[in-house]
């Protein structure tokens, strides 16, 4: 149990997708203007990562990995070269289902996220989470915890940035730094803050 708690805390704080690896920056910067929208997108990313990382773990372990098809009578087949294509396809299918669900049951959030909901499909934070899972050879349980933790870490970062940007609207910022300029500086300072977790031993 302690191992899973450690993995969760590590994926949220020490190896934060947005502030340690700078993954998913497109939507991270574009949808962080309002806290309500940022929370909505953050929840969507958590749900997608919690589903796609474990599903891609099963896909890798039982179909793509070298010797994975032994259960089907093909022990010598290695389909790992199809990994990237397969992972993106599974992520795209999951996002499409989530988009249809939100359109049907939560139309206000669907309209607020707008074009950025389909962009979750190509959000490199989600693909990065899947690739890290494969590279680190996580089992199914670890991939579930890692998917939830990595998604929660990204959601935490975008919500915090949105809160700061809402406060910055009322600040006297020099004209050349307004907009993305001060946002990049803010993200850099946030990432420095998260670097302090790097020395933690869990």
Curated annotation (Swiss-Prot):
TM region positions: 5-25, 35-55, 81-101, 114-134, 144-164, 180-200
Assigned EC number: 7.2.1.1
Location within or outside the cell: Cell inner membrane
GO-annotated cellular components: Gram-negative-bacterium-type cell wall; plasma membrane
GO biological processes: respiratory electron transport chain; sodium ion transport
Reaction(s) catalysed by this chain's protein: a ubiquinone + n Na(+)(in) + NADH + H(+) = a ubiquinol + n Na(+)(out) + NAD(+)
Molecular function per GO: oxidoreductase activity, acting on NAD(P)H, quinone or similar compound as acceptor
Keyword line: Cell inner membrane, Cell membrane, Ion transport, Membrane, NAD, Sodium, Sodium transport, Translocase, Transmembrane, Transmembrane helix, Transport, Ubiquinone
Membrane topology classification: Multi-pass membrane protein
Disulfide topology: none
InterPro entries: NqrDE/RnfAE, NqrDE/RnfAE_oxidrdctase, NqrE
Top-level enzyme category: translocase
Pfam assignment, any one: Rnf-Nqr
Family: Belongs to the NqrDE/RnfAE family.
Function of the molecule: NQR complex catalyzes the reduction of ubiquinone-1 to ubiquinol by two successive reactions, coupled with the transport of Na(+) ions from the cytoplasm to the periplasm. NqrA to NqrE are probably involved in the second step, the conversion of ubisemiquinone to ubiquinol.
Quaternary structure annotation from Swiss-Prot or TrEMBL: Composed of six subunits; NqrA, NqrB, NqrC, NqrD, NqrE and NqrF.
Name of this protein: Na(+)-translocating NADH-quinone reductase subunit E
Gene: nqrE
């Amino acid at each position: 149990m302690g191992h899973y708690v450690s993995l969760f805390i590590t994926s949220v704080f020490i190896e934060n997708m947005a502030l340690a690896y700078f993954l998913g920056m497109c939507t991270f910067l574009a949808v962080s203007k309002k806290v309500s929208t940022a929370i909505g997108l953050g929840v969507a990313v958590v749900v997608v990562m919690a589903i796609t990382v474990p599903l891609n773990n099963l896909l890798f372990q039982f179909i793509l990995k070298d010797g994975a098809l032994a259960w089907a009578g093909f022990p010598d087949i290695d389909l790992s070269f199809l990994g990237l294509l397969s992972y993106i396809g599974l992520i795209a299918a999951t996002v499409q289902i989530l988009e249809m669900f939100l359109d049907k049951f939560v139309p206000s959030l669907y309209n607020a996220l707008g074009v950025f909901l389909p962009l979750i499909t190509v959000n490199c934070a989600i693909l990065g989470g899947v690739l890290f899972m494969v590279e680190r050879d996580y089992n199914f349980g670890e991939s579930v915890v890692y998917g939830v933790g990595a998604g929660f870490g990204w959601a935490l970062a975008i919500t915090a940035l949105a809160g700061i940007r809402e406060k910055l609207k009322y600040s006297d910022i020099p004209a050349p730094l307004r907009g993305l300029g001060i946002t990049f500086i803010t993200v850099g300072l946030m990432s420095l803050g998260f670097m302090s977790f790097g020395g933690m031993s869990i």
